[in-house]
Amino acid sequence: RELAERLLTFPSPGRERPRLLALHASSHHTSNTMALWAQVQSRLSPRWEAEEVGLRNGTLSDCSGCPYTMCLHFGERGGCFYGGVMQEAVYPAVRRADALILMCPNYNDALSANLSAFINRLTALFRQTRFYEKAVFALVVSGYSGSDTVARQLISALNMNKSFYLPSNFALMETANAPGEALASPGIELR
């Protein structure tokens, strides 16, 4: 609820319905992170226009470290050497979005491989587009601990490195293990 309220009070960039891009690499069936997202998303309508992009099952190749000039060459043309879902779906969605929300299950105190690949591959788009006017939010679910570590990774990668701005209390962090456990946490409907 609190995260939804923060999104609802997000300053509109001159649009009646700001655009929110939700990125995840999780299974809807078993994911506590996605269950929390469904709860947050249900509170956003009709004020926000939300678009969801899934980055799982081998759809996203990580950056392999192109030379700077090659990354710059493709980035200035709105693409990336590796193409795929990043160039076809993610880059256009990031361009349209006023804010991003990342669903981040905590895997060993780190972002998932697919979300890390998203951040790495965002560099090519950053060559052409600055993100100063785009906010970043997060849902972080950990089995035991480390949500703060994952949130710090997002701050470092997206706020400090890629220039997304960081609203106060940008992340909802929860601890859950078994599927559905996050929604049973005391007071979760208020956070």
Question: Over which residues does each language-model region extend?
Answer:
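Short, catalytically relevant binding-site loops at active-site mouths
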Residues: 57-60, 107-109
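Glycine-rich phosphate/pyrophosphate-binding loop and the adjoining helix
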Residues: 1-47, 62, 79, 162-191
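Short hydrophobic segments within beta-strands
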Residues: 21-25, 53, 139
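Fold-independent oxyanion-binding glycine-rich loops
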Residues: 25, 55-56, 104, 122
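A short beta-strand-loop structural module common to alpha/beta enzyme folds
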Residues: 49-58
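Helix-loop-strand module that forms the ligand-binding subsite of alpha/beta enzymes
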Residues: 1, 81-161
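Cysteine-cluster motifs in flexible loop/terminal segments that predominantly coordinate metals
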Residues: 58-91
